[in-house]
C-alpha cells in the first residue's frame, strides 16, 4: 500500500503544480484593461502644454501654454487631498510659443515675444526633517535663468521645437515675420 499511496500522492502533486502554473500563466492571455482610480480638475487657465508626474508618483505637474505651472498631489497624504495644488510657479516673459518635451525628456521650452527662449524643467527637492520625507516642487533652468537668444532681430517666436542633452541644446523656431 505504501508504494500505491506514494504514487497517488505524486500524481496529486503534479496536478496541483499544473493547476498552479495554469493559474499563474492564464492572466497573460487576458485582454488589457484599465480603470480610473481618481478624477479631479485643476484650477488653471490656458491650454495644457505638458502634464506629468514625478518619479515617486506622488506629485503631478501641469505646464500651461501661458507659462503657469501648478504642482498637485496625485496620492492623498494625511493633510493633502488628491488633486490639491501644493505649489505654483510662473515662467516670466511674454510667451508666444511652447515646445513640449520629446518622449523621455523632462524639459519644456517657452519662446518669447522678444525672440528669446527658455528651457525649464520640474525639480523635486527631497528632505527628511524629523525623519519624515518631504518633497518640495520647484522649477529648474538647466541652461540658465537668462533666456537664450534665438532670433537676433528680436522677432516674436510663433512656433518652435527643441532637443537637449545635458549641456547642449538645438532649437528650430518660426518667427512672426
Language-model-detected regions and their locations in the chain:
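WD40-repeat beta-propeller superdomains and closely related acidic/aromatic-rich repeat-like regions
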Residues: 1-13, 17-177
